């Protein structure tokens, strides 16, 4: 396709720089930027986003050295892409350390979690949701994996969503 696939560390550094660049484009009439990977001179981005100051930045992943540091600097939402509640709690602590290092209130970052749906036991899914909410999750994504059982979306709407809303309070 002609699009280079950079090594993981470089991809993440490019992401961090791109976040800076995009925020400039969305908040200034013209933007100048001279980064390691991207350069702009008197660049414009029109029309500006309707959401002010700009749409939320969502960053997912759990890499402690780069991803969570970039999240601390730029994200409005961090998405924990899966794993145990204890791993989530550890990653949140690391994120808070990165926030402290850049002078940011970690409470400004919404904590999103992807929760795998247990098709055989939807009650177990609700219990998992409860554990993540108790651990500080503020946003939940019910993660459906193929093969999808017939009627699963309706079952989730009827059996899980009302109970999840009750958990979220």
Name every feature range the model reports, one short phrase each.
Residues 1-169:
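Active-site-adjacent structural elements that line small-molecule/cofactor binding pockets in enzymes
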């Amino acid at each position: 396709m002609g699009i280079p696939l950079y090594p993981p560390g470089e991809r993440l550094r490019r992401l961090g720089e791109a976040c800076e660049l995009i925020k400039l484009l969305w908040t200034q009439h013209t933007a100048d930027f001279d980064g390691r990977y991207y350069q702009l001179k008197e660049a414009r981005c029109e029309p500006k986003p309707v959401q002010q100051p700009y749409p939320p930045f969502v960053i997912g992943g759990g890499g402690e050295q780069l991803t969570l540091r970039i999240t601390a600097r730029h994200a409005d939402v961090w998405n924990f892409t899966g794993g145990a509640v204890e791993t989530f709690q550890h990653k949140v602590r690391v994120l808070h350390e990165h926030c402290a290092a850049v002078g940011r209130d970690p409470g400004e970052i919404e904590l999103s979690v992807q929760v795998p749906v247990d098709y055989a036991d939807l009650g177990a899914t609700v219990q998992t949701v409860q554990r993540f909410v108790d651990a500080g999750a503020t946003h939940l994504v019910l993660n459906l994996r193929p093969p999808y059982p017939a009627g699963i979306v309706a079952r989730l709407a009827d059996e899980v969503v009302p109970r999840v809303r009750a958990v979220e309070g």
